[in-house]
């Protein structure tokens, strides 16, 4: 688990999981 959430990395990881996009909330990657 990263301490700092990079929005671009989060977004790409969420896309790979089949989600539309990801955003960082309190340094945690949330997929939508």
From Swiss-Prot:
Its main location: secreted. Expressed by the venom gland. Keywords: Disulfide bond, Secreted. This is Peptide II.10.10. Negative results: has no effect on voltage-gated potassium channels Kv1.1/KCNA1, Kv1.2/KCNA2, Kv1.3/KCNA3 and Shaker IR (with inactivation domain removed) and on intermediate conductance calcium-activated potassium channel KCa3.1/KCNN4. Does not show antimicrobial activity as well. It comes from the Eukaryota. Belongs to the short scorpion toxin superfamily. Potassium channel inhibitor family. Alpha-KTx 10 subfamily. InterPro entries: Scorpion_toxin-like_sf. It comes from Centruroides tecomanus. Has the structural arrangement of an alpha-helix connected to antiparallel beta-sheets by disulfide bonds (CS-alpha/beta). It is found in: Secreted. Disulfide bonds join 5-24, 10-29, 14-31. One of its GO terms (cellular component) is extracellular region. SUPFAM superfamilies: Scorpion toxin-like.
């Amino acid at each position: 688990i990263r301490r700092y959430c990079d929005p671009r990395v989060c977004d790409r990881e969420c896309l790979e999981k089949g989600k539309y996009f990801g955003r960082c909330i309190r340094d945690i990657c949330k997929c939508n």
